[in-house]
């Protein structure tokens, strides 16, 4: 699991998916909305380890330190194998304290099973200044999880031309005070031609690769589509 939210919403999602335990939780950085629900999750589920960027373990918030959770650091180029997924750490490129958006742990997740395959870039709260640094090493992807909840600086046309995503998704709360996703972000995606999903309107969004493409299932009104 990547990030833990700030309240019990993630607990509800885990229960709906009939999750029994978690081998690992990856925390992209130490913003409260990315780790705040972790301790409650650990009270309900067995959590094997908490994965953070190199240097971030030493700066863990006190409630994480006191929880007894096993923190494991990873660095750029490390790989994490989850079933048929191979997740490669693309950022940060140096030791960080994990406190800032630009410290966000970024993963390229790749899945292959026979003729079914897809790649997805998971960006935490990173924005275009960081994304332009690691995007050339990523190359073409199928799915872009937008940085910083789809902020105005989460994406631009030159980044989209490098990554060439078919689908982009923003995770944002309804009526959030920041106005995420930003109009600039949505407009860039529309102009590029990438299909856009947001949890505000589409609810939980799931991706299922098969030989024909990627099926996208939303718990909201859009239902299921083939990309």
Give the predicted meaning of each segment.
Residues 1-227:
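Non-globular, low-confidence helical/coil segments that flank catalytic cores
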């Amino acid at each position: 699991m990547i990030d833990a939210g700030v309240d019990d919403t993630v607990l509800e999602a885990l229960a709906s998916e009939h999750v029994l335990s978690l081998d690992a939780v990856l925390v992209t950085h130490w913003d409260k909305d990315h780790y705040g629900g972790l301790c409650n999750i650990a009270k309900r589920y067995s959590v094997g380890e908490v994965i953070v960027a190199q240097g971030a373990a030493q700066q863990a918030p006190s409630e994480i330190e006191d929880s007894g959770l096993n923190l494991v650091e990873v660095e750029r180029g490390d790989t994490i194998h989850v079933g048929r997924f191979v997740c490669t750490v693309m950022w940060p490129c140096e030791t960080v304290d994990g406190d800032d958006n630009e410290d966000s742990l970024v993963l390229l997740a790749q899945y292959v099973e026979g003729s079914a395959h897809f790649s997805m870039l998971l960006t935490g709260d990173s924005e275009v200044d960081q994304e332009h640094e690691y995007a050339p090493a990523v190359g073409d992807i199928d799915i872009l999880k937008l940085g910083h909840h789809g902020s105005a600086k989460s994406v631009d046309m030159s980044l989209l031309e490098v990554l060439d995503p078919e689908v982009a998704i923003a995770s944002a709360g309804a009526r959030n005070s920041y106005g995420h996703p930003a109009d600039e972000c949505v407009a860039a995606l529309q102009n590029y031609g990438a299909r856009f999903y947001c949890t505000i309107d589409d609810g939980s969004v799931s991706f299922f690769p098969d030989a024909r493409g990627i099926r996208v299932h939303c718990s909201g009104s859009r239902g299921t589509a083939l990309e």
